[in-house]
């Protein structure tokens, strides 16, 4: 027998159907933020074009709320050679919409010449070392306060490879180099997240809109429309993972989970102290001064 929850599910399906008719990309940039010349920088290591949007809530908030300069590197442009030029342009447009900068990695030998996967690290150590050195030069040039990259168990070979390459790139910089690190999750949950970051509906709408600029990918699979559901599930899961079993959910309907640490003395050190939940209306200044 039909009941009120049928109406709820029917409405959810209907809004998804209507959302499929929304334009992909082609939107004017979101309102800009004035960035100081000496502003601290976030550097996102995106395994593929689109990851800068999917796990970009932290970077977006730091950009908008604290004036951080955000730059993204496409560590690869995907496995399809015929799509690489288009994917680079799609990422450029998505970054432009959000107010991020795109750092072209392909002139540095990244973006396709070497498969950024664990087996390459094992089977082609010279090619891997060249890619790590190239990425290290990018990091050294831009000197980020915060480096964002996938965690080491994020299932997808290129996500795991990007983590390994990022760590190896940091090792090329010597023991004096220091920055904060935020590990992300997408294909596989973090084993020990220590930050649940609330995402406002307006920020989420901009992330979904930015993701829609990756037109060639979302036409195949409209995964930009499932980003709100993923972020809603992060609240369900993160509230008890960080707050303890039986903890009440946070105040935000949407969130992203991260693992924060510091790269110092040639290694990644976990963030000291208890895990934290930062609501969309809370300041990030204590974590990212």
Tell me what each language-model feature is.
Residues 106, 162, 181, 221-222, ...:
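Residue-level detector of alpha-helical recognition elements and their boundaries
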Residues 188, 193-250, 256:
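A conserved mid-domain beta-alpha-beta active-site/ligand-binding segment of alpha/beta enzyme cores
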Residues 1-177, 190, 212-213, 265, ...:
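Active-site beta-strand->loop->alpha-helix modules in alpha/beta enzyme cores, enriched
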Residues 8, 102, 124, 226, ...:
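Acidic, low-complexity intrinsically disordered regions
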Residues 77-79, 105-106, 180, 229-232, ...:
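Short, intrinsically disordered/low-complexity patches at protein termini
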Residues 171-199:
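Short, flexible loop segments at boundaries between secondary-structure elements
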Residues 249-273:
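Acidic, Ser/Thr-rich low-complexity intrinsically disordered segments
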